[in-house]
A protein has these predicted regions:
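Extracytoplasmic small-molecule ligand-binding "clamshell" domains
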Residues: 29-96, 244, 253
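Beta->alpha turn/N-cap motifs
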Residues: 36-41, 74-79, 88, 92-100, ...
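Ligand-binding cleft/hinge of the Venus flytrap
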Residues: 60-68, 148-171, 202-205
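Short helices/loops that flank or line small-molecule/ion binding pockets
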Residues: 62-66, 74-75, 79-92, 106-107, ...
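Flexible hinge/capping segments at coil-to-helix
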Residues: 122-140
């Protein structure tokens, strides 16, 4: 090889190496975002054949994809889900979690839907339940650490002040167990977000109905640790999913179009 050919070969080699280096810099390797989720809350999140499915799962996957990453779901009990996040056992929580002032003291939220709470009873409403006040002297199944549990506690204080019988609150670690208690006739009502209530009414062959109007609609959000840049990235990704129609498609798939964030 003469000197001219050698010089050209060197230049081409350096140029190729530069292109490879620039390409590597432009396309960083995708990372895995681990989401803690209480997979006992259909249609938001549940397990089918050992695999997590639901609206929240689809949303987590869509957000991760939007960020050039991938999502991993880690089943975690709702009563320990924020401690798990704070202990860095996951990067975020997506679990139909209501964005409340109390929770916002511990974590940041990227809101993605607005959901109210609902009471569910057996078909025919044998206990004549019409709202929280009508639960006096009756028993209600609810999942631990939920906003519904907190609302029942507040209602009991109101009933006590009025000299009325309190609600018997039966707390379950899994929401599916709370719903099963109503089906088995062990309680008069089940109290949860409107999303699982509607799901159970639609999928149980006429065994259940709602009782009274939805209560206290509020935003639900993805929780992240304070100071974690993921929180801001999630907000941007959620806005993008609404703008490009992805969120609309996901919510429609699970029968949840009515719970989209209002503009």
């Amino acid at each position: 090889m003469n000197s001219t050919r050698w010089l050209v070969a060197c230049v081409l080699t350096v140029a190729a190496a530069s292109v490879i280096a620039v390409s590597a810099m432009a396309a960083p390797a995708a990372k895995t975002i681990v989401f803690c989720s209480d997979t006992t809350y259909p249609p938001m999140e549940s397990l089918q054949g050992g695999k997590a499915v639901g609206a929240d799962i689809d949303i987590a996957n869509a957000i991760a994809k939007s960020l050039g990453d991938q999502a991993q779901i880690k089943t975690t009990g709702f009563d320990v889900i924020i401690p798990a996040l704070l202990a860095k056992k996951c990067d975020a929580v997506i679990s139909a979690m209501t964005d409340t002032a109390a929770r916002a003291k511990q974590v940041n939220f990227a809101d993605y839907v607005t959901v109210g709470a609902s009471l569910m009873v057996k078909k025919g409403n044998p206990s004549h339940i019409t709202g929280l006040a009508s639960l006096s002297g009756k028993s209600v199944a609810v999942e631990a650490a939920t906003t519904e549990k907190a609302a029942l506690d507040v209602e009991n204080k109101t009933l006590a002040k009025g000299g009325k019988a309190k609600i018997t609150i039966k707390i379950f670690p899994a929401d599916t167990s709370a719903a099963a208690a109503l089906l088995a006739g062990r309680v008069d009502a089940y109290f949860a977000d409107a999303t699982p209530v509607l799901y159970y009414i639609k999928t149980t062959g006429g065994k259940f109905q709602s009782a009274g109007p939805q209560i206290e609609s509020a935003p639900e959000g993805i929780a992240t640790r304070k100071g974690d840049p993921l929180g801001g990235q999630f907000k941007t990704a959620i806005a993008k999913l609404y703008a490009n129609g992805t969120m609309k498609t996901i919510l429609a798939k699970w029968g949840l179009s009515a719970f989209a964030l209002k503009k």
